[in-house]
Amino acid sequence: METHPLNLAHQQHRRADAHLKNSKFDEAMQCHHNAAELLLDAMKTTSSTAALESITLQHSYHLKQKDLIKSKKEQYTRVKKAMENIKTLSKDPQINTQGIADAHGG
C-alpha cells in the first residue's frame, strides 16, 4: 500500500512543501510534477467515479502548484536582486554623500 501511486503522490506533496519552506523552488516544482504523474498512474487503478473525480482534482492542483511556485521563484529572484542592489548602493560613499546632500537641499 505504501508504494501505491496515490500514497507516493502524497509523499511528493509533503516533500514539495518542505522544499518550498527552504526556498528550493526547482525541487518543489519537480515534486509537484512527480505527484501529478503519480496521480495519473493512480487513476488507472480505480473505476470509482468518486475516486477518479478526487484524483483528477488533485492532479489539477499539483499542476497549478507548479505554476504558482514558478511565479514565486521569479518574484523571489527579483526581490533578492533588489536587496543586493540596495546593499551595494548603501556601501557606495559617493551615493551616500549625494543622498545626504539631496536630503538637506544641498
Language-model features, listed with the residues they occupy:
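Non-globular sequence segments
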Residues: 1-106
